UniProtKB/Swiss-Prot annotation:
Alphabetical GO biological process terms: nitrogen fixation
Protein name: Protein FixC
Record-stated family: Belongs to the ETF-QO/FixC family.
GO MF terms held by the record: oxidoreductase activity
Length: 435
């Protein structure tokens, strides 16, 4: 056993874990961070979106040092059927600001840099170290961790679980249940490399401008899921994900969906001639507010994806992860400054602080949307995209048919497929869940 005792042990070196370790180290706490990968980010080859406001609270000068790809000036949403898409997008020169609001990043590069800042702050970071279980005393209080290293048991006043959505430590220790299949999505992603000037021409970009495309519709074959495309400097991050429960129910494969997505007429021209160099699969928490587990206990707290903190409606995850990690660290620091033990009662302040933040407020607002989308997935991800595409094509095609007849034909198509009661019911349920 390692004799040295730590104020805190952080399990995981992703966004949430790094935020927690950095914040505690800056407070002067003795922090040990454990990561099973070869280096932080080694298991995160995919692209992602970084939200500047949350990063600034951790490292104000990050723009000067961090490996950033492009700042986002445009957001597109596509509702797709097999041959077309109906789009909505927002683009503004206001996002070409001195301190941009959002960036695309490559997680393998960014997480490695982020971890270097954790080390600079004074934390000890051990990679290639797997935490096998939580160490508990005879009163079931968490007092440290056990690892696969020779001197495997390490003690600390508190353990921060930042092990990701599929982390097993809390489950093995009986602290929380394993996420249900209908609360977790499996996403598959590829990195398509192209010359920088080709990417900028295809996406109408200049300099370091970036764009993100999010897509829903028949690409998920009636399952609850979405596709995405991020423009980076010299590559395009492309992927698709659906709920694990839906993959189990339908027998569809994520790889098959990804291949179909890449062949779609709206997507194929964007990646034509590209070279695929990286491929990954990743589990994402999708259950929202109702799936959040117990966030604290005797000697432990849980943050980020491990706490199911992901806004599936707005596709926000890294900002919730960083914020929860920072708030957990601040709560731990507050308990320590009072000279109090890391008991469940004292650590409950973490939940209070998180409840007062945008993290829980946003998740609570949309608490009914994830189950609604899952329960009525065939309507929202298959039927309506097909109906809307057909109606739009009818609307823009000029063939001598009077407009009033076109409108009646489109309405008749909706009513025939879903009925008046179905249409009204879907609209009511969606509006109620959105409010």
């Amino acid at each position: 056993m390692i004799e040295e005792r730590f104020d805190a042990i952080v399990v995981g070196a992703g966004m949430a874990g790094n935020a927690a370790a950095l914040t505690m180290a800056k407070q002067g706490m003795k922090v040990l961070q454990l990561e099973r990968g070869e280096y932080p980010g080694s298991k995160n080859v995919q692209g992602a979106i970084l939200y500047a406001d949350m990063m600034e609270k951790l490292i104000p000068e990050f723009r000067e040092e961090a490996p950033l790809e492009r700042h986002l000036i445009e957001q597109r949403f596509w509702m797709m059927d097999d041959r077309s898409h109906v789009g909505m997008h927002y683009r503004s020169e206001d996002f070409n600001e001195q301190r941009p609001n959002r960036y695309t990043i490559i997680r393998a590069q960014f997480d490695k840099w982020f971890s270097s800042k954790v080390r600079e702050a004074g934390a000890i970071v051990l990679c290639e170290t797997t935490v096998t279980e939580l160490a508990q005393d005879d009163r079931n209080r968490v007092v440290g961790v056990r690892t696969d290293r020779r001197d495997g048991e390490i003690h600390a006043d508190v353990v921060v679980l930042a092990e990701g959505v599929n982390g097993l430590l809390g489950t093995r220790a009986g602290l929380r249940a394993r996420p249900a299949p209908d609360n977790v999505a499996l996403a598959v992603k590829e990195m398509h490399f192209l010359p920088r000037e080709t990417i900028e021409a295809r996406f109408n970009l200049k300099g370091d401008e970036g764009v993100v495309i999010e897509a829903a519709g028949t690409i998920s074959r009636g399952m609850t899921g979405m596709g995405f495309i991020y423009a980076n400097k010299e590559c395009i991050s492309l992927g698709i994900g659906c709920l694990v429960a839906d993959f189990q129910r339908t027998g569809q494969t994520p790889y098959g969906l990804l291949d179909e997505f890449k062949r779609h007429p709206s997507v194929a021209p964007l990646i034509a001639g590209s070279e695929v160099k990286e491929y990954s699969a990743h589990l994402i928490p999708e259950g929202g507010y109702k799936s959040i587990p117990q966030l604290y206990g005797e000697g432990w707290v849980v943050v980020g994806d491990a706490a199911q903190l992901n806004n599936a409606v707005h596709r926000e995850g890294s900002n919730l992860a960083m914020t929860s990690g920072r708030i957990a660290a601040e709560a731990i620091g507050l308990v320590k400054s009072r000279g109090e033990p890391m008991s469940a009662t004292n650590l409950s302040i973490y939940k209070k602080m998180l409840d007062d933040s945008f993290v829980i407020k946003d998740l609570k607002k949309y608490k009914d949307l994830p189950p609604l989308m899952h329960t009525h997935s065939e309507n929202f991800f298959l039927t309506y995209p097909q109906l809307i595409s057909k109606a739009m094509q009818n609307f823009v095609r000029v063939d001598g048919t009077p407009k009033v007849e076109k409108e009646k034909a489109s309405l008749k198509s909706f009513v025939k497929t879903r009925s008046w009661s179905g249409l009204v019911g879907d609209a009511y349920r969606f509006a109620r869940a959105w409010r």
